[in-house]
Amino acid sequence: MKIEVNLDNNRLPDKYTRHAAVEYMEHDFPVVSFPFSIKDVPAGTKEIAFALTDLDSIPVCGFEWIHWLVAGLDGHDVDVPEDSSRNNPLNWTQGYNSSAGHIYDMKDQPISQHYMGPKPPSGVHDYTLTVYALNTKLNFNDGFWYNELIHNMAGHIIEKVKIDLPVENN
């Protein structure tokens, strides 16, 4: 299985990051999700789930920041279109990102269950998109947590792939 994302000078394009135009922002965060493709999905895959996280946030806030959580994607090759987090053309479920936690306390805001784009405070952060091919359907509703996803995937992961998407605060 592989993930394909179009980068701009080896970085996630500005439109999907802290450098986005104001019309692509909500609560001072970018909200237009980037397009990408998932190819060569293994046989027997019933569902695809993915997470976009930032390990480089650990020195900043003390934990891996969750930017986007999705489950319920059909288990075959797929092109995920731009802004699919807000438009949901693939009929998936979305979990809580880190804005729903106690630091931002935005659990009641729509952004808490959608793409919350990268906003590194300094330097370059690598945002990791991890895609999971699963041999079962998880049947989540919107508003699940990352730990629930991890626990429910245990023993059901056929394949897992990652890609790092650098974003620079310049």
Where are the model-predicted features located?
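N-terminus-centered regions that define maturation/targeting leaders and the start
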Residues: 1-170
